[in-house]
Amino acid sequence: MPDVAFATSGSTGPPVTWLRTEAQLQSEAALVREAVLGPARFGRVVSYAPPEHLYGRLYSRELPRVEGVPVTGLWDRPLALPPLDDGVPTLLVCLPATWQLLARHLPALARHGRVTALHSTGPTTPAAHRVTSHLAGTGFRAFELLGSTETGAVAHRPVAAGQHDALPWTLLPDVEVPHDVEPPPGAATDGDPADGHGAARRLRITSPRLARREGAEAPPDDWELPDLVTPVGPRTFHHLGRASRLIKVNGLRCDLARVEELARARCPGVDLVCAPVGDPVRGEHYEMFYVGPRPADPADLRRMLGRLPSGLPAPRAVHRVARIPRSATGKVLTAELTAARHPAEEPEHV
């Protein structure tokens, strides 16, 4: 059978096509079924992930085929509630935005008691942790996958309430980290090595499921993901964030995901994102983009933000835009966003 093509999201550059064999797809679905989801049986899969992307194809097509169960595809109806009235053991294939929907239907999920959620394509959201916290003890389970179009799933961990970031990731059984990989020059972070932040490195792995780039004769021997990690054990690690989300502003380390989390808490109802940009004085910086009728003036949004805690630098500029471009799986198309930006709409905050 011909290989199956999947394109990267184009979130940081032009999309690239990667090819996978049917055997690789079937192997990954079976592996995640056994190593992550465990022995529990499912009577139905409800998927919010579009099958033209790898994550959606694996768990909207391949896994149901392995299980021999029907699929309810809701990727074109992201606000549709999954069927929960019949008590059928259900696997929910979630995108980051799905958890807001689930958070509005906690009583139905609690009554059902036989729902498992699978999460990927982006970090878990505050809504995901609210859902798992509220449903603790009801039989609801949730798991998170880390991976990419190039590698497939690499590692997994439960989605938990509370100190979620403290939970280490575990490599999938067929994934290895080359022992000769050392942190590249400048990869170490500013933290104390004792707290797990002293030996950060990009995650490089080998796996029989690595995809083949279109035009290449074979898959690469290994692949380096844009994720910064610190080892915990031989097959576990802490995830510090994506390298593209961790910047240094005049020597001060800044996690853009953390800035977004704080900004959304202070500006409820505002759709906003941060994008890294080059800076002629500081080397690199970031700018904030938001959508919505309010506040009408970007300077008002900066005032709503106030002073960011923990020494996080304020955005270099704030832009109000007509829309935030996203891929079908919800990833922000950063290159498209920053290419269309206008000159700073309010004075730089130093």
Give the ranges of each region predicted by the language model.
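Conserved pre-ATP/AMP-binding loop-to-beta segment of ANL
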Residues: 1-7, 40-43
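Conserved ATP-binding loop and adjacent catalytic segment of the adenylate-forming AMP-binding
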Residues: 138-182, 190-201, 211-221
